[in-house]
Amino acid sequence: MTQLEFIEQIIKEKEAVILDANDKIWSYAELPYEETRSSALLCSILESEGFTVETGVAEIPTAFVARYVVGTGKPVMGILGEFDALATLSQKAGCTVKDPVQNGGSGHG
């Protein structure tokens, strides 16, 4: 099995969890620095997968770092994930024309 095939297999195995998290984060539509439910959800998922999670990073309550160490801990990979919503961009998921969930509400539109 190639490394790419291994990664594809893991993604397929975790597909339901990934899609559920995506849908929940979309529906929460939390503004910057207020992503408490989204952050808690992601931390919970990462912890259940064996990651060590540090919350409140840089004195931001919703910021976190998740670490998963195997062997020597090398190489190191960093990912920055943006999942906050923006004011007035409320939008129904899967819709390609403007169709807000709530007029003037926050969202990922």
What is the predicted function of each stretch?
Residues T2-G109:
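Acidic/His- and Gly-rich active-site-bordering loop/insert found
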